């Protein structure tokens, strides 16, 4: 009887821990938004490692080092919040909004998002996403020592234009901003690249 109670307590604790992890994944502006008990100095390390993984992946594909630099997370947060609302918390609908529209080669959500973020006419914007596994998150933020290689590959592979500026130059560095959260029970990172 006592062993049964212990098992139930363990299972309930595990379920509660998973629910807390999923609920604490939030989009972030500047630094990722954290639960009150998580120190904010830990929020940037995972993003730095993701940025390093992006640069490594880009170098492997195009032989261009340090192509991505840390930018503001504001646009990524805006896109994430738009996707969450637009999709009705349906991950498939959110992903569909991020895929390429064959009519104009931009992301399906481009017009709606551009009305919200009001980009500079001299800047090019891309949007991208990658799913995250639980081992890449810690207390709702990107984990410091996680292996982000596959995430970086997805972020580069899933990039879609929001707007293409006439001043765009392919070799120019891109500012990268990130937002991490959960849509439809799936943790993901949304990235916005600006050049």
Model-derived features with residue positions:
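A well-ordered secondary-structure block
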Residues: 100-195
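Short, well-ordered surface patches within globular domains
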Residues: 30-117
